[in-house]
Amino acid sequence: MSESHSQDGAPQALDMNNELRSRREKLGQLRQQGIAFPNDFRRDAVSDQLHARYGEKSNEELEALNIEVSIAGRMMTRRIMGKASFATLQDVGGKIQLYVARDDLPEGQYNEQFKKWDLGDILGTRGKLFKTRTGELSVHCSEIRLLTKAMRPLPDKFHGLADQETRYRQRYLDLIANDESRQTFKVRSRIMAEIRRFMMDNDFMEVETPMMQTIPGGAAARPFITHHNALGIDMYLRIAPELYLKRLVVGGFERVFEINRNFRNEGLSPRHNPEFTMMELYMAYADYRDLIVLVETLFRTLTQRVLGSSVVHNGDQTFDFGKPFTQMTMKEAICHYRPETRPEALDDMASATAIAESLGIKVDKSWGLGRVQTEVFEETAESHLIQPTFITAYPAEVSPLARRNDDNPFFTDRFEFFIGGREIGNGFSELNDAEDQAARFAEQAQAKDAGDDEAMFYDEDYVTALEHGLPPTAGLGIGIDRLMMLLTNSHTIRDVILFPALRPQK
């Protein structure tokens, strides 16, 4: 008798109502016996460790070693064959097969307990390792216990939960059912650990800055608003930690970084979630060119340590992070991907506006030349930046926190880097001229008054901090979720966030 699910997804035995009723009755019996949810079983191994250590050994070698293990996990399949059964146990490391025989257990346990347990129940078992005739590493159970009664059945297709909406709304089912999802989030955890290791190795100090702020700053985005009852003031979930981190550099912490959540009250898309993870770092006595070297080194290190190779495959694209990234200015990128564009046409407001409008861009009368150039770049070039590429020379108009370029103050010493047609990060030499910063904040405030919801607020305290002296500094932000999409071959941000934002169910 087999208890996996049929191909059409319907349980083989009872309909759902009867299934739930049956499981509740079984739990009621366990409660009466006083053993409903025991908590005294301890395991000494997990499945992947056992496969790694003993998977290549023969049955004769395992018999000679006489290895007894205690493992625990969720029963995913069971095949009852009279006086003996095979079951699959799934734990954090993967799966391992159990062999359960009536005569190896206390009298009555096999028929009265084990055979009545359900798929999805969490079991603890102890027994010796052996190999079946087909060579599968298994545990010959001498003790087996029910640790948690599952009140609901496994997803219809335990080999892979097919419904995308269910995967995101009930991530726990996705993690039970899909090996690929479990692996994605394991890799995410390793990447996060390796980023922190890299930063520590480069003498950065990890810090935490406020998630609720009285003035949101550090990015052009619409914030979430909340209210602090005790203080009687509105506050904002942060859109970026930048201005607080630079205050720390003013205070003497010369290399700082933070990995944490940002919140932006914007739309949902395969690349956007309103709550997302960013890393920002700031290093004194450095400029944007030092950040370019740091980014290339970080990606090379991450891919080697986590994936074992600097070559990454994502869909039909391949990236080699062992090589330097391509570099080009924003104007060069526009002219490269829209060859009919003359460079000098981008330097004139009228001709640049005509180019933008020919691309279907609705130019707002409040925009300056820098904003128009940036919109044209995003429309013509951004999606074509497949191989790792730094785009430099962003206009000051769209870079209110970046240092102006010494040779041409229309531009800033800033870059964004793109991989697979996606912006992954943004870095620049920091503006440390308090008067220039105050003037740019004033421009942003005017834009906000004119209806630009994403323009920055004027942060007077930050200007005061700059007046105390910010050393020459470079700062970088990397979108961790987009990085995870890249390194785990995922095609939507929902696949790399455990609990993504979703529209309410109707």
Curated annotation (Swiss-Prot):
Keywords: Aminoacyl-tRNA synthetase, ATP-binding, Cytoplasm, Ligase, Magnesium, Metal-binding, Nucleotide-binding, Protein biosynthesis. The keyword GTP-binding does not apply. Signal peptide: none annotated. Mg(2+) 2 binds at E423. GO terms for molecular function: ATP binding; lysine-tRNA ligase activity; magnesium ion binding; tRNA binding. One of its GO terms (cellular component) is cytosol. It holds the Pfam family tRNA_anti-codon. InterPro entries: Aa-tRNA-synt_II, aa-tRNA-synth_II, aa-tRNA-synth_II/BPL/LPL, Lys-tRNA-ligase_II, Lys-tRNA-ligase_II_bac/euk, Lys-tRNA-ligase_II_N, Lys-tRNA-synth_II_C, NA-bd_OB-fold. Its cofactor is Mg(2+). Binds 3 Mg(2+) ions per subunit. One of its GO terms (biological process) is lysyl-tRNA aminoacylation. PROSITE patterns: AA_TRNA_LIGASE_II. Mg(2+) 1 binds at E416, E423. It catalyses: tRNA(Lys) + L-lysine + ATP = L-lysyl-tRNA(Lys) + AMP + diphosphate. Homodimer. PANTHER family: LYSINE--TRNA LIGASE, CHLOROPLASTIC_MITOCHONDRIAL, LYSYL-TRNA SYNTHETASE. NCBIfam families: lysS_bact, PRK00484.1. Belongs to the class-II aminoacyl-tRNA synthetase family. This is Lysine--tRNA ligase. It comes from Sodalis glossinidius (strain morsitans).
